Amino acid sequence: MSAGRLARVALALWAAAGAACGGVGDSERLTDAQQVIADMKIGPSDQQRGGLTIVGAVDHADHRYHVGEPINLSIQVNQAAYVAVLRVISNGATTLVFPNRRHTSALLAANVPLHLPDPGAPAMIAAETPGVALFEFVAATRGDSWLFNRKPLTAADFSELGTTTRTLAKDILLSLRVGHGTETAASHLALRVRGD
């Protein structure tokens, strides 16, 4: 088996595992505000062979965290693409966690996982409030969307996008130009955060 074919098979297996783990189970029901972001028609994460795919994973296989516990993310695309990662908590408060102050470029190489935080670096993302936290992973072959160029204000690590997810979802879709010559893909994970 050639190295290229082996890499494609490995990515497909990783994507299938991520899709199986990335579903929202009964115990991880999204709020209406989170569901709006999860339902954006950006593009499937499992497009036919040759299409852009994005897979996100976390360091806890069961997707369960305690408040204050660090969350380590990994993201991978099957072709060079611009990537954004959104975190949406239960009340709809949405944060752009990638790109961020430490990682200003949204461009990822094909089949090279990005780890947040970098190995050996201090934690960047923590489980903040009890309930379900949604992570939405977005990729596009064009990088002209504001989603890939947004800079955090002041000394913050991340950009806060507000709580009006319906307006935000519409703005994201318009900015990505979904269906107008740009390949796009999305996937998501729902995490359970416990307060005890």
Where does each model-flagged region fall?
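Hydrophobic h-region of N-terminal signal peptides that target proteins for export
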Residues: L13-G22
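General helical structural elements
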Residues: V9-A12, K170
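Secretory-pathway glycoprotein ectodomains that are cysteine- and/or Ser/Thr/Pro-rich
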Residues: C21-D196
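Bacterial N-terminal signal peptides that target proteins for export
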Residues: M1-A10
